[in-house]
Amino acid sequence: MEVSVEHLGGVQFEIKARQHTIACDQPPENGGYDEGMTPPELLLASLGSCVGFYAAMYLKKHKLSLGGTRVHVTAEKARAPARMENFRITVEVPGEFSHDHKRGIKEAAHQCLIHNTLLNPPKISLEVQSVALLGDLRI
């Protein structure tokens, strides 16, 4: 898996993966124009959409309605070091479901790659490289 993130100016970035593009920005109080989600919001979105995928797969497998299903994700900011903590995920599925199906949806959501990555922190390496530029072109 790979994404590229390019600085557009100010505190704005363009994120690309395959043929998809997402804008990342900051609200005005952080020097941005609020034209895209912030990095922490993108993390919450990643977790929520991943959990939603697994919940939808469970519903589909059991021939249950998945229209209108929503996932809400919240987290709190923590300091020292700066990070997010106390993630809370709520899966809202329209209609009435048995306790077994609610448990099944929860178990399916626990298969989410992002959820499991956050629960089992990966090793992260960081490298800084100098690149030569000719105008806007990298050479």
List PLM regions with ranges:
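Extended beta-strand/beta-hairpin segments
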Residues: 1-45, 55-139
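Alpha-helical metal-binding/catalytic segments enriched in His/Glu/Asp
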Residues: 50-51
